[in-house]
Regions:
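Alpha-helix C-terminal capping/helix-coil junction sites
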Residues: 22-23, 58, 170
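Residue cluster at the C-terminal edge of the helix-turn-helix DNA-binding motif
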Residues: 42, 59-60
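Beta-hairpin "wing" of winged helix-turn-helix
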Residues: 26-31, 60-68, 74
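All-alpha effector-binding/dimerization core of bacterial HTH-type transcriptional repressors
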Residues: 75-237
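N-terminal leader/targeting segments and the immediate start of mature chains
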Residues: 17, 58-59
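Extreme N-terminal segment that seeds HTH/winged-HTH DNA-binding domains in transcriptional regulators
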Residues: 1-45, 93
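Residues in the helix-turn-helix
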Residues: 49
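Short, hydrophobic-biased segments on the C-terminal half of alpha helices
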Residues: 54-55
Length: 237
């Protein structure tokens, strides 16, 4: 543990080592931290000691634990976005449990419409994400999002089932500033109705919007379909 301070308790030495690795970029923002077993072997200590070090990193917001997945490097804007009322925090505040399932991820050309929307070339790539948001295991909304790849190099490497898209944008250097949205009601297709445990033709709340950064650059187009009985939750993505 060459880069540790010897007069500190072992778990604090390890915490400092891991924090320094995060600061240096050895563990990039959004990436998974090695497992407790791997770290215990590396530092020649017990899992309990590693867990104590990780607990401190969680408290400081430098990492986030996700059950069944592991620990991920957090971001300095995390607390701010949670306070802004994101899906995860809004649901947690209600006493329920949120989860996100990634249905599909791909890249596609912008084409004329989205090139004009984002101010990019028609042959520039968009990162397309389709997600299912759940509360206590029950599906409540489907969201389709398009993001210009040239604005967020490496976005496909962030686990967006762990980090919200707004957190991800911050991680990659662009802070969302404002959104222009419109609300409507539409009948669900058979595919979307099946995902939401509804019948084809049932009505859903539709929110479509464009998000901008502080410079006025459009960074995200999103469209979501939400079950009417989930309307008690207010959140943005």
């Amino acid at each position: 543990m060459a880069d540790a301070v010897e007069d500190l308790p072992v778990y604090k030495q390890i915490r400092r080592c891991i924090a320094e690795r995060i600061e240096r970029g050895d563990y990039p923002t959004g990436s998974m931290i090695p497992s407790e077993n791997e770290l215990a072997e590396e530092f020649g200590t017990t899992r309990l000691t590693i867990r104590s070090a990780m607990d401190e990193l969680v408290k400081s917001g430098q990492i986030r634990r996700v059950q069944g997945k592991g620990a991920f490097v957090g971001h300095k804007w995390f607390d701010e976005h949670e306070r802004r009322g994101g899906f995860r925090q809004s649901v947690l505040a209600s006493g329920a449990t949120p989860s996100v399932r990634i249905l599909a991820r791909s890249k596609r050309y912008a084409g004329p419409y989205y090139a004009d929307l984002f101010g990019i070339a028609e042959d520039d790539l968009l990162y397309s994400v389709r997600r299912l948001n759940c509360i206590d295991g029950e599906p409540v909304s489907i969201e389709m999002t398009l993001i210009p790849c040239l604005l967020f190099p490496g976005i496909e490497g962030v686990d967006i089932s762990v980090f919200s898209l707004f957190e991800t944008y911050d991680m990659l250097g662009r802070k969302p500033d404002q959104s222009v949205e419109k609300l409507d009601i539409e009948a669900l297709s058979a595919r979307d109705a099946s995902l939401l445990n509804l019948e084809p033709g049932d009505l859903a709340l539709v929110l479509e919007g464009l998000t901008y950064d502080s410079s006025g650059q459009a960074i995200e187009h999103a469209k979501s379909f939400t079950r009417g009985d989930a309307g008690g939750y207010t959140y943005n993505y």
